[in-house]
C-alpha cells in the first residue's frame, strides 16, 4: 500500500509534477517559435521604423536588411546606435551618400548599417567608467567592432568609437534598445571601397610598358639603369666583328593592351556585376534573362570590356519587354538583333546624353547592330530615343555606371527605322507633235478662188 501525504499518494503527486513540467516545456518552446517566426508589435524594429530616425529607417529598408534584423531579434536582444537625421541629410558627403545608394554598392551599405548594431543589450547603465578604458563589442557587420567609453572631464559623456551619445536609452523595448548618436559611424572597409570606386583603381588601365631594348654590342636585353655597368678598361664583351655588324632590324613592340596577359580589365566580372545590379534594382528581369539565358550576349560583352571597349546599354524595363509579340521574337537571331540595337559602343551617362541633345538638337549613336544608328533628341526634359510609335524615353538614369559599362533604363523597345522605298520615276521626254506638212500659200489661194466659182475640180490637188 502506497504511503500518503495529507491524504494523497506519492505516485499521484509524482505524476502531477511530471505533467506540469512537460506542459511548461511545451509552452516555452511554442513561445520561442512564435518569437522567431513573427515580430511582436512591441519590437525594437517596429520602434525604429516609427521613430524620429527616419533617415536611418529608410536606409535599412533600401539595404534589404529587415529580414536579417528580424532573424537577429528572434535569437537575441540588439542595441542600435541611430544617427540623427541631420547627420545623414546635411553633414554627410553627397558623393559618399550617392555611392551608398547605388545598387552596385549594396554590400557596402549593408556593412555600414550592420556596424551600428550590437547583438546584445547594452544600456546606458552598462557603460564603462572613465578610468576603466574602452570596452569592445562585436557588431552584426563583417568583423566590425565598436568601442564604448566615457569622455573624461565631461560629467560622464558617453562615446561609441568617437561619436557622442546624444540620446541614451532613447527607445527601450523588451528585445532591444536604441541610443541616439551625433553622427554616422563609417567602417574602414566601406571607406576603402568608396575611395577605390572614386579613384577608379579597380577599373583603370595601368601605365603602358615600353618594349624591351636590345644592346647591339651584346645582342642581349639592355639592363636597367640601376644595374652595374661594365667597368672602364675591361676587355670587350664581343669580338670586334660582332660589334661592327649591323644590329637586328626589330621594330619596337607595342605596349601591352588592356586585353593582354595582365588582364587589366576583368570584363566578365563587370558584366556579372551589372546584371546582378539589374536583378537587385528590380523591373529589368526580362532584360537580364535575355542577356544570360536566351543569348550569349553577356559573354560577348565581357570579352569586349576585357579588350578595352566601353559600352552603354539602353535597358527596356519588363513592361516594355512584355509588349513584344511572338512574331518579333520567333525569327532566328531576333533576340540578339534586338539587343544589339540597344548597345552603344560609347560610355554615355544620362547627363552627357541630355547635354548633347540640348546642344545639338538631334544626335545619332552608333550601335552594335551595324550599320543602324539610334537617334536621340530632347523631349519633355528628358532624352527620347527613336521616333513615332517605336520611341522610348530615358526614365531610369544611371542604373549602373562604373567607368566601363553604363546602363540607362528606357520605357520602350527600340527598332531600326524602316526607310520607305522611294519610287523611282523614269524621266519622260517631251511629247513630239507630228507637224502636218502645209501646202503652199499660192496653191491654197488658187483652190479657194476656184472653189468660189465652182471650178475647183480643175486642179487635182484641191
Swiss-Prot record:
Belongs to the fasciclin-like AGP family. Gene3D superfamilies: FAS1 domain. The keyword Ion transport does not apply. The lineage of its organism: Eukaryota, Viridiplantae, Streptophyta, Embryophyta, Tracheophyta. SUPFAM superfamilies: FAS1 domain. Residues 1-25 form the signal peptide. The gene is FLA18. This is Fasciclin-like arabinogalactan protein 18. GO terms for cellular component: extracellular region; plant-type vacuole; secretory vesicle.
Amino acid at each position: 500500500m502506497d504511503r500518503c501525504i495529507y491524504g494523497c499518494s506519492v505516485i499521484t503527486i509524482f505524476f502531477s509534477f511530471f505533467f506540469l513540467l512537460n506542459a511548461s516545456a511545451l509552452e516555452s518552446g511554442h513561445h520561442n517559435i512564435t518569437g522567431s517566426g513573427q515580430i511582436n508589435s512591441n519590437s525594437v524594429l517596429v520602434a525604429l521604423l516609427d521613430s524620429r530616425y527616419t533617415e536611418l529607417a529608410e536606409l535599412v529598408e533600401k539595404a534589404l536588411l529587415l529580414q536579417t534584423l528580424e532573424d537577429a531579434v528572434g535569437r537575441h536582444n540588439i542595441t542600435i546606435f541611430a544617427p540623427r537625421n541631420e547627420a545623414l541629410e546635411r553633414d554627410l558627403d553627397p558623393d559618399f551618400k550617392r555611392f551608398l545608394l547605388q545598387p552596385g554598392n549594396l554590400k557596402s551599405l549593408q556593412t555600414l548599417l550592420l556596424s551600428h548594431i550590437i547583438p546584445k543589450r547594452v544600456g546606458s547603465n552598462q557603460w564603462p567608467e572613465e578610468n576603466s578604458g574602452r570596452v569592445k563589442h562585436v557588431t552584426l557587420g563583417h568583423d566590425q567592432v565598436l568601442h564604448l567609453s566615457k569622455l573624461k572631464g565631461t560629467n560622464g559623456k558617453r562615446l561609441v568609437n568617437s561619436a557622442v551619445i546624444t540620446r541614451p536609452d532613447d527607445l527601450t523595448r523588451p528585445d532591444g534598445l536604441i541610443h541616439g548618436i551625433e553622427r554616422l559611424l563609417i567602417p574602414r572597409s566601406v571607406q576603402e571601397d568608396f575611395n577605390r570606386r572614386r579613384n577608379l583603381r579597380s577599373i583603370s588601365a595601368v601605365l603602358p610598358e615600353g618594349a624591351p631594348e636590345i644592346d647591339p654590342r651584346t645582342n642581349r636585353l639592355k639592363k636597367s639603369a640601376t644595374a652595374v655597368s661594365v667597368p672602364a678598361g675591361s676587355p670587350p664583351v664581343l669580338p670586334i666583328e660582332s660589334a661592327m655588324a649591323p644590329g637586328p632590324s626589330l621594330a619596337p613592340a607595342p605596349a601591352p593592351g588592356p586585353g593582354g596577359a595582365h588582364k587589366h580589365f576583368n570584363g566578365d566580372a563587370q558584366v556579372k556585376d551589372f546584371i546582378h545590379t539589374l536583378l537587385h534594382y528590380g523591373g529589368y528581369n526580362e532584360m537580364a534573362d535575355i542577356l544570360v539565358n536566351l543569348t550569349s550576349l553577356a559573354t560577348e560583352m565581357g570579352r569586349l570590356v576585357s579588350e578595352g571597349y566601353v559600352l552603354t546599354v539602353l535597358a527596356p524595363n519588363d513592361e516594355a519587354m512584355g509588349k513584344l509579340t511572338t512574331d518579333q521574337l520567333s525569327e532566328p537571331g531576333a533576340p540578339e538583333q534586338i539587343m544589339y540595337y540597344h548597345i552603344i559602343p560609347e560610355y554615355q551617362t544620362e547627363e552627357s546624353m541630355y547635354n548633347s541633345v540640348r546642344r545639338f538638337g538631334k544626335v545619332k549613336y552608333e550601335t552594335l547592330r551595324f550599320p543602324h544608328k539610334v537617334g536621340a533628341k530632347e523631349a519633355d526634359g528628358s532624352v527620347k530615343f527613336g521616333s513615332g510609335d517605336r520611341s522610348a524615353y530615358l526614365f531610369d538614369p544611371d542604373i549602373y555606371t562604373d567607368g566601363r559599362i553604363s546602363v540607362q533604363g528606357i520605357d520602350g523597345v527600340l527598332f531600326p527605322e524602316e526607310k520607305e522605298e522611294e519610287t523611282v520615276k523614269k524621266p519622260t521626254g517631251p511629247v513630239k507633235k507630228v507637224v502636218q506638212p502645209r501646202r503652199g500659200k499660192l496653191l491654197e489661194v488658187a483652190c479657194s478662188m476656184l472653189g468660189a466659182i465652182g471650178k475647183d475640180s480643175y486642179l487635182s490637188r484641191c
